[in-house]
C-alpha cells in the first residue's frame, strides 16, 4: 500500500458551476487553490491539465494521488455530472493524469469530512443549544444544486460518512404561499424536488412564482437581465424591493422545513450544518430570517428540534479540506 505521507496530492471539488483545485503539500496543508468555471473546459481532464500546467513551477514532484469530490452520485466507474456537461471514467481519468490512485466521492461526502475538523470561527450558530457528542450530524447546503449527507463519529474517533441524494426528495409546501410556489414549479417540471427551490436557480424560480401573485402586480420588479440569485438577494437586503425580500424569506422558510425533515430523519442531535456559497452571502440576515422558526415548527417534535443547533459553514474551501481527509482515510483503511 502506498505510504500516506506521499505528497503533493491533487485535490478537486467539482460543483455544477465551478471546479476548485488545490495541492495538498502536507497533511491538512493545501496550497495553489484555484477556481475554474466548468463551462470553460470540454472535460474534467482538460481542466485538471490546465490547472497543473499553470502551477508547474510550484510542483517539485508530480502528484501520484488524487482525490476529487463531484456533485453527483457515484455509482461505478462512469460519472455523469448532474448540473454540468462533464462526464468521465474514473479509471481512464486516473490513467490520463498519470495517478497511482484516484479517489472520487460525492461532494457532500467531502463536506461532511470537512465538518470534523472545523473550529468555532469556521461556523456561525443559528439557534439551538449544544451538539450531542457522537450523535449523527446532518450536512446539507444549497448551491448550484442541493447536497445532503450524514457524518457519524464513532466512540473510537473514527469517521463514517453516509452519502445521499436528499436534495431530490419531493418538496412539501408548508402553507398557502408555498402551495402557490409549488404549483408554479409543477407547471414546469414533472417532479418538484426540494432542489428546485433550494438552490441558486431555485431562488429565481421562487421569485418568478411570487411575481405572479395579484398583490405583487404594482411592486418594483427586476428586469430579465437582473434575474439572478445574487441580484435577488442583494435587492432583498437593501429594502427597496419587497418582492425580492419575500423571495428570500420564502427561500429561508423552505430551507428550514427541509433542514428539520433531515434532522428528524437522522436524529441529528450532533447538529445540522449548512454548507454552500449561498447562505454566507447574507449571514446576518439569515440569523434573523424565518429559517429557525420554521425549523422548529414541527408540531409534537418542536421541542426536539429546538435543542438542535444549526451551524452555517463560513470556511471558504471546505470541499478541498474534506476531500483531502477522505483520501487520508482511504489510504489508511482502504475504504471511506
UniProtKB/Swiss-Prot annotation:
UniProt-annotated location(s): Cytoplasm
| Name the UniProt record assigns to this protein | Glucokinase
GO BP annotations of the record are: glycolytic process
Gene from which this protein is expressed: glk
Give the top-rank taxon of the lineage listed in the UniProt record for this protein: Bacteria
| NCBIfam families in the record | glk, PRK00292.1-3
- Where is it chiefly localized? cytoplasm
Keywords, sorted A to Z: ATP-binding, Cytoplasm, Glycolysis, Kinase, Nucleotide-binding, Transferase
PANTHER family, alphabetized: GLUCOKINASE (PTHR47690:SF1)
One cellular component term from this protein's GO annotations in UniProt: cytosol
Organism annotation:
Helicobacter acinonychis (strain Sheeba)
Reaction(s) catalysed (UniProt annotation): D-glucose + ATP = D-glucose 6-phosphate + ADP + H(+)
